[in-house]
From Swiss-Prot:
Annotated organism of origin: Drosophila mojavensis
Name of the protein in its database record: Nonsense-mediated mRNA decay factor SMG8
Compositional bias (Polar residues): 686-702
Alphabetical list of PANTHER family matching this protein: AMPLIFIED IN BREAST CANCER 2-RELATED, NONSENSE-MEDIATED MRNA DECAY FACTOR SMG8
Superkingdom of the source species: Eukaryota
Ranges where the record places region Disordered: 627-702
Acidic residues bias locations: 628-639
The organism's taxonomic lineage, starting at the top: Eukaryota, Metazoa, Ecdysozoa, Arthropoda, Hexapoda
Pfam families: Smg8_Smg9
Length: 967
């Protein structure tokens, strides 16, 4: 012990001399446990008892230091826990996770285990606090301790102790007594006076607060068997250290000593000081009290001397030694002794068993026991002590129930992802009314899973998007051959006479073909009209497929060069691959047909711009019988051909003829369209040369072309699509709905003929076109072979004045139809029809979408759906070549030979309802952009052309002139 008056050691390493001294006490050993908070580096809470550990002591969690003063009956156990700042700092340094809640509850769980041990092995437990007021969190700790003791410890500890030699000593309560709880506060409030009355008053006030809190939360009860701790009756159990400085600040003391040394008072007092002192009313005025004054109040000195933690503790130790430990603490006492003192040896045996069961086995992961209650204590105690987690989880469960209920109550029978997301957002708001804490994210994830499972349980909508961007409303789990979005549009048929209700299309075929074919059955006009037959895909095998553009384009592009002579040294691999892909290959060694086709192409004086897959060929023989409306006989191969693209009245025409461009350029006028006539003998020679290489039964239009019979074009034909691919069905429609007389410019389009037009927007625009014909030059013109009629036209001139009626029709989803008088203006009756209105219309780009002028809460977009053309009664044919630019694609009719519109007839060209490129759907815009009306698509200007009508008189000579209207 050396200079110290006490012994200290680490449990269980008790020194032999101390063991012999404790053995002399027999059954009069009182064990006092000291636990609580500390701020020192050694985690010492024994400073109030004037005891300290060794200087080399290192604190650790769960470490127990024993203190014993010889001559006393008190064995003090100092518990080092996570409530000590030194131990807590060690745990923080070793912490790797940033989850503070998890760290905090683990630190609290360790403290609860150590305090649980103290309550089972000690007679008196002193809780030390560094604060000046009572820490109410201790009440929570006591609640946890009571829960653990009643729900876990009492279920296994008495039974397992009875299996050892200490079971009879501790009894059914598994502890020597209900320990008396004392509270020691190391610091006294600075603003309180340190007199006996004030200190006692403050201690009594704190005792009342502690007593009421422990009573309120059933920590302290009247029954000794159910009470966790005991409090003495009519005896002080709260101690405030008001006089001693337990943890002095060494630096502050050094600074104070330095100031005292440097400011020594003078030994002699000056005369002036003596004069001032003589004026004092009494001795000691304006001077500090000396030692004599401090010794005057002996009662205060005695109180200060006796008011120590050791004296405070010994009063309770004496109660334990005298057998008054439980008297006054409980109103209900059992007949069996509630308190018993053990010898040092017996207590050490009990301590070893309880320490092993409560502390040691917890850290042993390999420990196995058959006692299920003890196994639950070892594995589940930490979770059961995490009451914050239980609290937050309970709130999250309440919020989860509320959120799920809100979701299910508002959920319809069948709904899609947008509705699901909105319902989930509403359920989240309902959850947040109750859910709180760190487990909100987990609860929200569970809420999302529950709602998703509820949605997928027969309530999920198919949600296959239509070509207009609307989801399918049918149940996903139920088999359905046809999708349906529940949205119905009003649309007209090909001829425009009949309107019907169309469902939102989900395939390109439904949008551009099937609906119009179904409506044509109900339309009296559609079944009678003559239609232009567009080139379509004809399969040669049963397992034909859509073209894969990424893989097929190299072969498709390579196949375009097969008409050119092959380069010497090339292998036959490409030819073999092409033979498999296409059913009708043309070898590169046979260029003769190509040259003859080129000869036919050169016969036109003013060709239109290049269209899909070939040069423009205006030969009337290339159109077949489907376009010879109003003619009684087939086209003669010897007839001349002329063609040109119609230009505006202010734009000069440009001749592209090989032989006569220089001769006719000077003759072109500013306001006329010049057409160069081809001599019949030249055309006849070219036709005969072509017939030598082709079968006699085939015309120019029916010649075999390079088209695939195994792969088809999945989308619409556009300028960049391969010429070898054809679509499965036509997305366009061109029909002659009757003679030109069915349209009256005075009344416009009548409802019985074209239904759904808005008032004033049902007029076609007149278009005056002036044409001048250039006859071929002959060295010896065979005038003797001309008829009289042709000679009269020849003499009267070669000018034509054509009046064409054109209308650009737009149609909205409500079935409203209207014409446009300019790219940015809807036709408003006859007042909007001016002389140059149509010229400005056809020579400018037209927007593909335009706002419908119909009144409604929602603004509907109308789409360019039809072009109305009333052809003139003149010996010319109108040629249509529409090009619709949507995004990066420019869509065309996909015809190698452009269609001719017959004379004096009413023609309607119906545009596709939906545009689709190479496997890329082009959705309509959500709204119209006035600043850029062509952003969503446009019809390019210059879609009309003109060609001379072929004569039906096969007896006429090649040099006979054509019949035409004079200017």
């Amino acid at each position: 012990m050396s200079s110290k008056s006490y012994y200290t050691w680490k449990y269980p390493d008790i020194p032999e001399n101390v063991e012999s001294m404790l053995a002399e006490l027999n059954n009069s050993l009182v064990v006092v446990g000291v636990i609580g908070r500390s701020r020192g580096p050694q985690a010492n809470k024994m400073s109030a008892f004037d005891m300290r550990p060794n200087k080399l002591h290192e604190p650790a969690d769960g470490q127990i230091l024993c203190y014993y003063k010889p001559g006393t009956n008190t064995l003090m156990l100092h518990f080092e826990t996570t409530y000590d700042e030194a131990v807590l700092s060690q745990q923080l340094l070793s912490q790797t996770s940033i989850d503070f809640d998890n760290f905090y509850y683990r630190m609290r769980s360790r403290f609860v285990r150590n305090m649980l041990l103290a309550l089972h092995v000690c007679h008196i437990v002193v809780y030390v606090d560094t604060a000046e007021i009572f820490d109410t969190t201790l009440v929570t700790i006591c609640q946890l301790l009571k829960y653990v003791r009643e729900q876990h410890v009492l279920e296994f500890l008495p039974q397992m102790l009875h299996e050892t030699s200490v079971g009879l000593m501790l009894g059914d309560r598994a502890r020597p007594c209900t320990p008396r709880m004392l509270f020691l506060f190391e610091n006294y409030p600075r603003d309180e006076e340190k007199t006996r009355d004030h200190i006692s008053s403050y201690e009594f006030k704190t005792e009342d607060q502690i007593y009421h809190l422990l009573r309120q939360y059933n920590i302290l009860t009247n029954n000794v068997n159910t009470s966790l701790v005991a409090l003495p009756n009519n005896k002080q159990f709260v101690f405030y250290n008001a006089h001693e400085e337990l943890h002095p600040d060494q630096l502050s003391h050094a600074i104070e000593a330095l100031n005292t040394t440097m400011n020594k008072p003078d030994a002699k007092e000056e005369d002036e000081d003596l004069d001032i002192i003589s004026l004092a009313p009494f001795e000691g005025f304006v001077k500090p009290f000396g030692a004599d004054y401090k010794t005057r109040d002996s009662k205060e000195l005695d109180y200060k001397k006796n008011h120590t933690a050791w004296h405070f503790l010994q009063r309770h130790v004496q109660d334990a030694l005298q057998g008054y430990f439980d008297e006054g603490s409980f109103k209900l006492l059992t007949q069996t002794p509630q308190y018993q003192l053990l010898s040092a040896r017996d207590w050490h045996s009990c301590m070893a068993e309880i320490y092993r069961l409560l502390i040691q086995n917890v850290h042993d992961a390999n420990y196995v026991t058959d006692n299920t209650n003890y196994q639950a204590y070892l594995r589940e105690l930490n979770e059961s002590l995490n009451y914050e987690k239980k609290f937050w989880c309970h709130l999250c469960e309440l919020g989860l129930k509320k959120g799920v209920s809100a979701y299910r109550n508002a959920a319809p029978a069948i709904y899609g992802s947008a509705t699901h997301n909105q319902l989930l957002a509403d359920a989240t708001l309902a959850f947040e009314e109750e859910g709180r804490g760190p487990y909100v994210e987990m609860a929200l994830a569970k809420l999302s899973d529950v709602c998703l499972k509820y949605w997928h349980d027969g309530r999920q909508q198919c949600e296959q998007l239509s070509l207009r961007g609307h989801p399918c409303t049918l149940p996903k789990d139920l088999a359905h051959d046809k999708h349906s979005s529940g949205i119905v549009h009003i649309s007209s048929c090909n001829c425009g006479r009949t309107q019907g209700r169309r469902e939102d299309p989900f395939t390109l075929r439904q949008a551009n073909y099937d609906y119009y074919e179904q409506l044509a059955v109900m339309c009296n006009l559609c079944v009678k009209v003559k239609k232009f037959q567009f080139p379509l895909f004809t399969p040669s095998i049963s397992d034909y497929r859509a073209a894969a553009f990424e893989a097929a384009f190299p072969l498709l592009l390579a196949s375009k060069n097969r008409l050119e002579p092959a380069v010497q040294g090339d292998s036959d691999l490409d030819a073999e691959a092409a033979d498999e892909l296409y059913s009708q290959p043309i070898k590169a060694a046979e260029p003769a047909p190509q040259k003859q086709l080129q000869t036919l192409g050169d016969c036109c004086s003013q060709p239109l711009s290049a269209t899909y897959g070939s040069d423009l060929n205006m030969s009337i023989a290339g159109f077949g019988d489907s376009l010879n409306e109003g003619e009684d006989a087939d086209a003669d191969a010897d007839s001349p051909e002329i063609r040109s693209q119609i230009c505006s009245s202010g734009q000069s025409s440009r001749s592209r003829s090989n032989s006569s461009s220089s001769d006719t350029s000077s003759a072109n006028t500013e306001n006329e369209l010049v057409l160069q006539l081809k001599e019949r003998s030249d055309q006849k020679n070219a036709t005969e040369a072509l017939s030598e290489s082709c079968p006699e039964s085939q015309s120019v239009a029916s010649m075999p072309e390079l088209v695939s019979t195994t792969e088809y074009l999945p989308g619409l034909v556009h300028m960049c699509s391969a010429c070898e691919l054809l679509p499965l069905f036509p997305s366009w429609s061109l029909a002659c709905v009757g003679p030109s007389s069915i349209y009256s410019h005075n009344t416009g389009l009548q409802e019985h003929f074209q239904s759904g037009f808005l008032s004033g927007a049902n007029f076609l625009l007149p278009w005056d076109v002036h044409v001048r014909l250039l006859q071929p030059h002959h060295k010896h013109p065979p005038l003797q072979q001309m008829g009289k009629k042709n000679q009269r036209y020849r003499k009267q001139g070669d000018r034509l004045a054509l009046k064409i009626f054109v209308g650009f029709e737009y149609e909205c989803s409500r079935g409203h139809r209207f014409m446009m008088c300019s790219p940015d203006r809807v036709l408003r009756g006859g007042a909007d029809i001016e002389r140059d209105t149509c010229s400005k219309l056809v020579n400018n780009n037209m927007p593909l979408y335009f706002p419908c002028p119909c009144r409604g809460q929602v603004s509907f977009l109308a789409q360019l759906m039809r072009i109305h053309v009333v052809t003139p009664k003149a010996p010319v044919n109108i040629i249509v070549d529409p090009k619709v630019r949507v995004g990066k694609y420019t869509f065309t009719l996909g015809c190698t030979v452009l269609p001719r519109l017959s004379q004096s007839a009413y023609w309607i060209l119906r545009f596709p309802y939906v545009y689709q490129g190479d496997n890329v759907l082009i959705a309509p815009p959500a709204k119209f952009e006035p600043d850029d009306p062509f952003a969503s698509g446009c019809l390019l200007a210059g879609m009309f052309g003109i060609a001379e009508t072929d004569t039906t008189d096969a007896i006429q000579s090649a040099g006979a002139p054509l019949n035409f209207t004079r200017l």
